[in-house]
Amino acid sequence: MDDESRLVAYQKAKYIKENMFGRTFHLHFHILENLANTFEKDDLTYVEIGTFEGGSLSLMMQNKKIKNLIGIDPLCIAGQEENLKKNTVKFNIHGSNVQHIKRYSYDEAIFPILDTLPNGIDILFIDGDHQYQPVINDFNLYYKYVNKGGYIVFDDYQDYRWSPQVMPAVNKIVADIQAGKYSPYKFEVIGCYPNNTGEVVSNIPVHGDMNNEFILKVVDK
């Protein structure tokens, strides 16, 4: 994943932001596009917890390798569901299978749906409740669905101004991984890539240095 490819992905995310219905909070999720492009297969499944109005989901719909997309969100903010539906229509340029699950991520009704996925999850984006325990809970509930070679990405790891509990939650998960708590599952801790886009989150200088998304890769299960 070189600097040039990340800049290309950033421009795609910027296009989404400038043309979508509603809004997205930052463009650091462009790294999801780069992760999708690391796969050799072209029938990927992407799942995100916390869809909001569909910025990151819209970016992933632009990638022809991703055939199945699932967004999980209670959609309880005024205008959110309408904008999400409009963005799905506008940006689903490859006719991908897109499913919106209008529930909280811990709702037991979700897991039978995931159990029926024929090929598991290739990329899981955790961008829901940014409090400490909910971040850990989302990981614990969903990591087993991610395929060997797949990625788990946490949003807002660097944003200690607006989401100060994400970093300690992810650090706890990493510590538990290193302690063998999740055995026989094994993860490569990739962490955050350097930010070469110039975009700053929350006007905090550190966000000019590092991408805001923290990445784990499933290497065995």
From Swiss-Prot:
Pfam families attached to this UniProt entry: Methyltransf_24
Annotated InterPro entries: SAM-dependent_MTases_sf
Protein name, as recorded: Uncharacterized protein R132
Species in which this protein is naturally found: Acanthamoeba polyphaga mimivirus (APMV)
